[in-house]
Amino acid sequence: MKPEIQSSLEYYSDLIEHMDDSHIYSLIFQANSIREKYKGKKIELCAIVNAKSGLCSEDCAFCAQSSRYKTNSPVYSLLEKDEIVKKALEAKKYGVKRFSIVISGKKPSKKELEKIGNSIEAIKKIGIYPCASLGLLEYDEICYLRDKGLERLHCNIETSERFFSNICTTHKFSDKVKTLENANKTGLSICSGGVFGIGESWDDRKEMAEFLKNLNVDSIPINFLTPIKGTPLESKKPLNPMEALRIIILFRLILPDKDIRVCGGRPLLGEFASWIFIAGANALMTGNYLTTTGRHYSDDIKFIEAHGLEVDSVVS
């Protein structure tokens, strides 16, 4: 890494961590200016379908879908293509640009991968970008999905490499990185971010931003922990709104030209929810999340337009 890049990472991270809330406005101004420079007034929307839920073999401490924890998460096998496409059509109707098939588990079986490929092919035909979040995939599996029309592969690194073992022991940070590198080799766009408020430090956040910058990801999902009863993190105190905004600012300043996408946990922002845009976010996940309820598409569109911004719904 170039010395000047390392220097800016440390400078911004230290500044954001230690700055008093009353002095955060200068950073917000800077983050907003960078967002407008690279992204203009466009806000990109994505939506997901929880296409296979529950009974996951992995032990991610924040996740309700792990078979190791007793939660109220729904359990069902892979949805049929028609049901997935129906949900994609609903999202497209409201100007959502990207639609992702998300499944529980370490990775899909060969039969599941084939069915997902057929669903991707159908989604592509309706004029919305097909994305997928399918766990840990090999190069040839990603090539198959790309050839079916997949545009972007998602695989969250979740946190920094040094903190990762505190939240997951059934697979390694390097396993996720391998999946993302495989996707890069195929020419696919890649999406990777994580969950915040899981016990990580500001150094972990800085390291994570640095790693994603080096990996040259296109989209960074920012999720704020929603503690779920039955998981190891059920007693974690949610982040306060100002700290959540600082995280968005950090990622915008370190990854100025990338999509900073606010996803799960938005309700914790409360009356500061509208500040996500001036803090640097240029993308949102809309609709429901995997195991928690989100906002309806129409509500998010009104939310965006109320701030003088517009939905980026153009699919080239």
Swiss-Prot record:
It catalyses: (4R,5S)-dethiobiotin + (sulfur carrier)-SH + 2 reduced [2Fe-2S]-[ferredoxin] + 2 S-adenosyl-L-methionine = (sulfur carrier)-H + biotin + 2 5'-deoxyadenosine + 2 L-methionine + 2 oxidized [2Fe-2S]-[ferredoxin]. Gene3D superfamilies: Aldolase class I. GO terms for biological process: biotin biosynthetic process. Its cofactor is [4Fe-4S] cluster; [2Fe-2S] cluster. Residues 38-266 form the Radical SAM core domain. PROSITE patterns: RADICAL_SAM. InterPro entries: Aldolase_TIM, BATS_dom, Biotin_synth/BioAB, Biotin_synthase, Elp3/MiaA/NifB-like_rSAM, rSAM. [4Fe-4S] cluster binds at residues 56, 60, 63. Pathway: Cofactor biosynthesis; biotin biosynthesis; biotin from 7,8-diaminononanoate: step 2/2. Its EC number is 2.8.1.6. [2Fe-2S] cluster binds at residues 100, 131, 191, 261. Keywords: 2Fe-2S, 4Fe-4S, Biotin biosynthesis, Iron, Iron-sulfur, Metal-binding, S-adenosyl-L-methionine, Transferase. The keyword Glycosyltransferase does not apply. Transmembrane segments: none annotated. NCBIfam families: bioB (TIGR00433). HAMAP family: BioB. Belongs to the radical SAM superfamily. Biotin synthase family. This is Biotin synthase. It comes from Thermodesulfovibrio yellowstonii (strain ATCC 51303 / DSM 11347 / YP87). The lineage of its organism: Bacteria, Pseudomonadati, Nitrospirota, Thermodesulfovibrionia, Thermodesulfovibrionales.
